[in-house]
A protein has these predicted regions:
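Hydrophobic faces of well-ordered beta-strands that scaffold small-molecule active sites
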Residues: 1-4, 35-37, 59-64, 95-97, ...
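Aromatic-lined substrate-binding rim segments of carbohydrate-active enzymes
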Residues: 43-63, 82
Length: 178
């Protein structure tokens, strides 16, 4: 389960005062044993493992705010290193990738119509190539990339998502976000 059920990382005014312990107690009481990471979880891999073990829980995924739409593959690999190692240390097999480059997510004064967009197939192909290579890198480290399309980002609409998935291989999975 994702801690967004209790506390929202994007809009801290929604549950920002809810302690992590409340999420863990209530989540495990209703039968969940796996949690996606949020901002309230310990950053240190060993502290994270110990915290979750205290509730009989494990890490099942961790969000990564990616910038491949406007950055390089090499920079993204450097940026993800500590997070990926934390997931691997904790036995986690899935990383949720959300593209945040140029995103208007969280900017409530900016209309969603001003979100970034790829306007040519060449831009889509370049992005898909980098994302696919990033997914291959994660896979070589035992992690599956689960792509999270998102409101206010480059990949938002059904058409965007269809285009992206057609241009990538099984190195890029799709997150079912309910």
């Amino acid at each position: 389960i994702n801690p967004i059920s209790w506390t929202n990382d994007d809009l801290p005014q929604l549950g920002g005062d809810t302690p992590l312990e409340t999420c863990l107690v209530e989540g495990t009481e209703i039968g969940y044993v796996g949690f996606e990471l949020g901002n309230k979880f310990p950053k240190d891999p060993a502290e994270l493992k110990a915290k979750l073990a205290g509730y009989g829980a494990v890490v099942v995924s961790g969000w990564h705010s990616g910038n491949l739409a406007e950055g390089t593959l090499e920079d993204e690999i450097k940026a993800v290193d500590a997070h990926m190692k934390k997931l691997v240390f904790n036995g986690c097999k899935v990383m949720v990738y959300g593209e945040v480059a140029g995103s208007v997510q969280g900017q409530q004064q900016v209309p969603l119509s001003r979100r970034p967009r790829f306007t040519t197939m060449a831009q889509w192909e370049d992005y898909a190539k980098k994302l696919d290579a990033f997914g291959a890198y994660l896979k070589s480290n035992g992690i599956t990339l689960a792509y999270h399309h998102h409101m206010g980002a480059y990949c938002e609409s059904t058409q965007d998502l269809d285009t992206l998935m057609k241009l990538t291989t099984d190195n890029v999975g799709l997150l079912f976000d309910t």
